[in-house]
């Protein structure tokens, strides 16, 4: 099979908002309309992002950036994110979400209930981008002109975000992770790791990889996106030990036997969590709250730390039994992290 080595990466909504905010601040302070801006990212890379439009008035400046999803099938591709900047009386940077930005209506998400759905990482990205321009106080207003309409086609409402889209992103970069070419890239990366290690750590996403890097050499960690099952099968033929390390939401799908965790392949996260919680003997009142939650993060707010550990141990044991069927001769290990990076369960390690 020929690998398409020119797969296009994209930018997250958070990166688009950061670029729009920086362009707006440059317009406000320098009266300059930039066609591109360069922003810092949490992973140390700098991104040059096109700016679609800049409007400058005496006391306010607005800029628009289009989200670009690369080769990912993404309904948000081409969505305009607009940021307006004006001076703030103090030296703080205040970030406000308005039209088209979703509002958080349930607990358990990264943004606090009642706030707009702008993640803490994105807020930090925006602040860092602006601080490259000025140390003055700035108020940034984020709008997504078509956000409310587009949000109806996403899963936002199911997790308690209403009225618009979420402004998210842990790295600023969107990786093409859902097609067959990507699986071939995984195969190649596994072969490279094999030259130096007899074990590999499989992490579904950026946060899992970050937390795993605190336990293992980062050079033996591979991010596999949704292709968890295929990656484990490939790795089981190459390594003596295969470690699956992830966060609860993704791994609850694997608990249910869903090895391609793309949303189109099924969900069962809360059903799986409820099932494991029953097996763990959690009280009926807690079970009711868990089953009625809109997200795993919300469900976790109803559980004590000890209950989380007990439930995730059951989840990890079941996952271990599932992946052992791929190759009985391999030492498999499952690690489940809490959302703050703490290890909730380690089975087979």
Swiss-Prot record:
Gene3D superfamilies: CbiD-like (3.30.2110.10), CbiD-like domains (3.40.50.10720). This is Cobalt-precorrin-5B C(1)-methyltransferase. Its EC number is 2.1.1.195. GO terms for biological process: anaerobic cobalamin biosynthetic process; methylation. One of its GO terms (molecular function) is cobalt-precorrin-5B C1-methyltransferase activity. Pathway: Cofactor biosynthesis; adenosylcobalamin biosynthesis; cob(II)yrinate a,c-diamide from sirohydrochlorin (anaerobic route): step 6/10. The keyword Methyltransferase applies. It catalyses: Co-precorrin-5B + S-adenosyl-L-methionine = Co-precorrin-6A + S-adenosyl-L-homocysteine.
């Amino acid at each position: 099979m020929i690998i398409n080595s020119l797969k296009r990466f994209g930018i997250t909504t958070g990166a688009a908002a950061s670029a729009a905010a920086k362009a707006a601040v440059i317009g406000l302070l320098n009266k300059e309309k930039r066609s591109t801006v360069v922003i810092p990212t949490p992973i140390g890379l700098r991104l040059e992002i096109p700016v679609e439009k800049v409007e400058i008035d005496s006391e306010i400046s607005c800029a628009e950036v289009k989200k670009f999803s690369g080769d990912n099938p993404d309904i948000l591709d081409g969505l305009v994110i607009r940021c307006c900047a004006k001076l703030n009386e103090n030296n703080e940077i205040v970030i406000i979400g308005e039209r088209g930005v979703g509002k958080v209506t349930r607990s358990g998400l990264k943004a606090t209930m009642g706030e707009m759905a702008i993640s803490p990482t994105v807020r930090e990205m925006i602040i860092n981008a602006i601080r490259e321009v000025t140390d003055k106080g700035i108020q940034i207003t984020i709008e997504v002109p078509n956000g409310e309409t587009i949000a109806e086609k996403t899963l936002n409402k199911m997790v308690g975000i209403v009225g618009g889209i979420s402004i998210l992103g842990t790295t600023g970069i969107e990786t093409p992770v859902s097609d067959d070419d990507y699986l071939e890239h995984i195969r190649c990366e596994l072969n490279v790791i094999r030259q130096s290690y007899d074990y590999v750590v499989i992490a579904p996403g950026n946060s899992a990889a970050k937390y795993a890097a605190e336990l293992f050499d980062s050079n033996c960690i591979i991010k596999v996106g949704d292709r968890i099952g295929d990656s484990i099968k490939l790795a089981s033929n190459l390594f003596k030990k295969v470690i699956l390390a992830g966060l609860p939401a993704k791994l609850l799908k694997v608990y249910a036997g869903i090895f391609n965790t793309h949303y189109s392949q099924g969900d069962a996260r809360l059903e799986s969590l409820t099932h494991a919680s029953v097996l763990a003997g959690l009280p009926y009142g807690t079970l009711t709250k868990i089953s009625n939650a809109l997200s795993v993060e919300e469900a976790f707010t109803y559980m004590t730390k000890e209950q989380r550990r007990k439930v995730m141990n059951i989840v990890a044991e079941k996952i271990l039994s599932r992946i052992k069927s791929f190759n009985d001769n391999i030492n498999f290990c499952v690690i489940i992290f809490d959302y703050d990076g703490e290890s909730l369960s380690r089975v087979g390690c």
